From Swiss-Prot:
Recorded catalytic activity of this chain's protein: urea + 2 H2O + H(+) = hydrogencarbonate + 2 NH4(+)
Keywords: Cytoplasm, Hydrolase
InterPro entries: Urease_beta-like (IPR002019), Urease_betasu_sf (IPR036461), Urease_subunit (IPR050069)
Domain of life per record: Bacteria
EC identifiers of the protein: 3.5.1.5
Protein name: Urease subunit beta
Gene name of this polypeptide: ureB
Gene3D superfamilies: Urease, beta subunit
NCBIfam families linked to this entry: PRK13203.1 (NF009682), urease_beta (TIGR00192)
GO cellular component: urease complex
Length: 102
């Protein structure tokens, strides 16, 4: 083994297995691009993004950690979200929850 080396098993690594997911259509109604990161509480994303915020409470993008999705001005796209896990508490972001989700 080389110092710092990471040895993984053969094959693909599946993310978020058996976690609730949902697909939502999102439109950027603003005049600037908007990026949403992998672990951002999606319901609190930029207000220029139009989608059902109530439906997305407690969800984040179902993408690899450290990545983001970019919404260009006027663009609409469908994204897949995955339920937050752990304690299911949300603090910060846009300050709209500041506590337990459930």
């Amino acid at each position: 083994m080389i110092p710092g080396e990471v040895i993984t098993p053969e094959g693909d690594i599946e993310l978020n297995v058996d976690r609730p997911t949902l697909k939502v259509s999102v439109a950027n109604t603003g005049d600037r691009p908007i990026q949403v990161g992998s672990h951002f509480h999606f319901a609190e994303a930029n207000d220029a993004l139009q989608f059902d915020r109530g439906l997305t409470k407690g969800y984040r993008l179902n993408i690899a950690a450290g990545t983001a999705v970019r919404f260009e001005p006027g663009q609409s796209r469908d994204v897949e979200l995955v339920a937050l896990s752990g304690k299911r508490q949300v603090y910060g972001f846009a300050g709209r929850v500041m506590g337990a989700l459930d």
